């Protein structure tokens, strides 16, 4: 990874999903519609300071957006604040540079009155379109999607989490020159090790931008924050377990885990006709090397024993990992008392092929069934 000062420049004028954020978006969307009505063929070449100044004036005229600063209450916001609020919408993916359009879900976001739905729409828009290197007059680059890149880096990390320090290191990446859609965790940690002093200096100098990004992540659906870490909501029990202090979590050996997953992929290729989910027989782009006996409860031999694993899709991995399903010695799926009937009806006929059920794997599955029974007994 190379260090660039074109870091992820996040701008926040208003809190996300607040009345002022929504009002700013509403005015921008209505103005863009007016521009398109007058000139249906409007493109970035038609953009001018006159068009931008008109938008600024409309935002300054909104009663909802009047200043709340002491001594300036009820007065129009200054131009710096107005520009910042427009760039916030551009960077987060709600409106396009040069005011050429807005996200296809922007109007639905404005119209919904239900907070849960608004949070979902916000998360999707930011995930699909956020580009923190944008400003109002930057040429669009659909390749660069910062939150998408960050979330994919999280998903591809076998530990299922990212630390705040790792996220700060990602902020130093110029995605315009990077070809992948995520950053391998071992390379990211090596970059941190080699650039500790620079990262420490960046933390002090760009404290606000780091705080803005951390705050944005807290607004995204299905992203769970604990102390200085994030993980997917569905993975939080696996990642953090029942422990309050993450320092007690057992650490995986990256190389041994790669070997473990590779062996499961080889087994899948041999018996499933390719690297596929061992249950669905589908070649998902992301497959999880799911432990049968939980990693945290395994000794060193068990932790990297491919017989103590199944290659699964994310959905089935979550159900299996959280003990909502298990399997008997014949490969038949077993239902937890905690699993809803509609989910069970969807998956119940999927089974493990007998060729995958060697004696060692059966022993691990017996342990897994006992864990499922224990979880059910708590309810």
Curated annotation (Swiss-Prot):
Catalytic activity, as annotated: Endonucleolytic cleavage of DNA to give specific double-stranded fragments with terminal 5'-phosphates
UniProt keywords, alphabetically: Endonuclease, Hydrolase, Nuclease, Restriction system
Enzyme nomenclature, EC number: 3.1.21.4
Entry-linked Pfam families: HNH_2
Transmembrane segment boundaries: none
Record GO terms (molecular function): type II site-specific deoxyribonuclease activity
Signal peptide limits: none
InterPro entries from the UniProt entry: HNH_nuc
GO annotation terms (biological process): DNA restriction-modification system
Name the UniProt record assigns to this protein: Type II restriction enzyme HphI
Species of origin: Haemophilus parahaemolyticus
Gene for this chain: hphIR
């Amino acid at each position: 990874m190379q260090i660039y000062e074109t870091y992820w420049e996040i701008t926040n004028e208003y809190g996300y999903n607040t009345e002022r954020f929504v009002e700013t978006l509403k005015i921008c969307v209505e103005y863009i519609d007016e521009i398109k009505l007058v000139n249906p063929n409007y493109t970035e070449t038609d953009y001018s300071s006159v068009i931008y100044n008109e938008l600024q004036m409309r935002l300054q005229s909104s009663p909802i957006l009047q200043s709340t600063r002491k001594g300036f209450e009820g007065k129009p916001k200054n131009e710096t604040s107005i520009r910042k609020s427009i760039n916030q919408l551009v960077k987060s993916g709600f409106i396009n540079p040069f005011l050429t359009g807005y996200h296809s879900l922007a109007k639905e976001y404005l119209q919904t009155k239900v907070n849960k739905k608004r949070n979902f729409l916000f998360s999707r828009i930011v995930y699909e379109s956020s580009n923190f290197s944008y400003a109002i007059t930057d040429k669009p680059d659909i390749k660069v999607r910062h939150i998408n890149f960050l979330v994919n880096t999280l998903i591809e990390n076998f530990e299922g989490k990212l630390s705040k320090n790792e996220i700060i290191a990602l902020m130093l990446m110029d995605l315009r020159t990077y070809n992948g859609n995520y950053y391998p965790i071992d390379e990211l940690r090596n970059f941190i090790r080699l650039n500790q002093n620079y990262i420490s200096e960046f933390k002090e100098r760009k404290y606000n931008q780091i705080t803005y990004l951390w705050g944005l992540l807290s607004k995204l659906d299905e992203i769970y924050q604990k102390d200085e870490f994030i993980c997917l909501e569905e993975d939080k029990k696996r990642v953090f377990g029942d422990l309050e202090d993450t320092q007690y979590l057992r650490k995986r050996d990256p190389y041994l885990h790669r070997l473990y997953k590779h062996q499961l992929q080889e087994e899948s290729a041999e018996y499933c006709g390719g690297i596929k989910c061992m249950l669905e027989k589908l070649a998902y782009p992301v497959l999880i090397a799911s432990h049968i006996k939980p990693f945290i409860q395994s000794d060193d031999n068990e932790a990297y024993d491919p017989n103590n694993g199944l290659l699964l899709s994310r959905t089935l991995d979550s159900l299996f990992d959280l003990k909502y399903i298990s399997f008997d010695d014949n490969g038949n799926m077993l239902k937890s008392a905690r699993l809803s009937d509609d989910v069970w009806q969807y998956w119940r006929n999927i089974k493990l092929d007998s060729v995958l059920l060697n004696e060692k794997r059966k022993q691990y599955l017996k342990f897994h069934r006992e864990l499922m029974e224990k979880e059910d007994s708590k309810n």
